[in-house]
Amino acid sequence: MEKDKDKQICWGIIGAGSVCRVKSAPAMNKIPGSRIAAVMRRTGEKAREFAALHNIPRWYDDADALLSDPDVNAVYIATPPGSHRELTLKAAAAGKSVYVEKPMARNWQECRDMISACKEAGVPLFVAYYRRMLPNYRKIKELVDAGVIGTVRSVHIRMNKPVNPDFDRDPGNWRVQPELAGGGYFYDLASHQLDFLDYLLGPATDACGIASNQADLYPAEDIVTGSFRFESGVQGTGNWCFTAAKSDEDDLITLTGSKGVLRWPTFAGYYVDLKTDAKPDAIRFHFDMPEHIQQPLIETIVRELQDWMVHDRSDIPLKYKAPDSMEASAADDATGEMAGSADAAGPADSAGSADSADSAGSADSTGFAGSAGSADSGDEVRRCPSTGITAARTNRVMEALTGKNPM
């Protein structure tokens, strides 16, 4: 019984807005071995209301007070990106495991600071790129890994969104305030797309682009056009226009292979279209989403943290793929994902499963946040695929695509 208590993940939530209320917090209380121990909001009354709604025993209106709570052993940072670095550094210094909302920070340097702090403190760092664990994205990975569309050649992202003048001009809309978000809607939305492509195709080695503000509704960029190349050799292009006509609203990713093509939306539906030379008539897979969309990812984080705690917070040998673009002192993410399959059935020729390793590679680190270790052949592969290192790569690519920091 005492051992089970030692494995309990007791969350402290900092920031409890709409994302937290719907996508993540309820899941934390539903997952075995996980519970919310405390919540913090700047307005005490709102914190108290949130605590009452989710049966949370303690609430705070000060982040430092929550971080000092001895019952909290993991912190979920659900504030705008502008405060992610500061709060992550404080959480790491307090010895708390960290799960931070996406995008990870406003820029790549802040991401690196967060990784370094967690490495020095010896605590895990995870980022809320939850799409990696959803059934539609697991099906995409399964199909690609099984070679159903052959060798992947290229990828194109197209996103057109019309303006919403009242909301876009709202001072409370932090997503278009660079000092709070790092950029505009591109940073908020494209980060999901670029993160998944990193997971699917490996790290990007080159990226460049141009960005501008066409509608002058807010300070951040509202159109981005760019190109990128992955370590695997796949080339990609993207166009993100947040000033488009309503009649041309679009959201589609096209992944072209030597034997077929996959197409799917990021936000406009939960389906995947497949066409191959062998089966030219399109096959559409439909998927049901979990009630709380972050739950599959949070489940993997809880299980991984429990493993870490059972090993007395020592290094667990894990495989990972080291990108050339990151400093040698930083450990990388693991290459595996949690076992499971998509809800929709695959075509007859889609052999394989979504829990296979992404890519081969040498390993000399655990990949939590960078502590030393080893990874021999046959060692357990990480359950959680979304770490500080993978998320930092996404920030790096976004900076290059917007022309802020060329790669």
Where are these regions (language model features)?
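N-terminal Rossmann-like dinucleotide-binding module
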Residues: M1-H54
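C-terminal helix-rich "cap/oligomerization" subdomain common to oxidoreductases
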Residues: M1-Q8, S34, A74-I77, Q306-G346, ...
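Hydrophobic residues in well-ordered beta-strands that form the structural core
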Residues: C20, Y60, V100, L125-V127, ...
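Contiguous beta-strand/loop segments that form the cofactor/metal-binding neighborhood of enzyme cores
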Residues: L194-G269, I298-E337
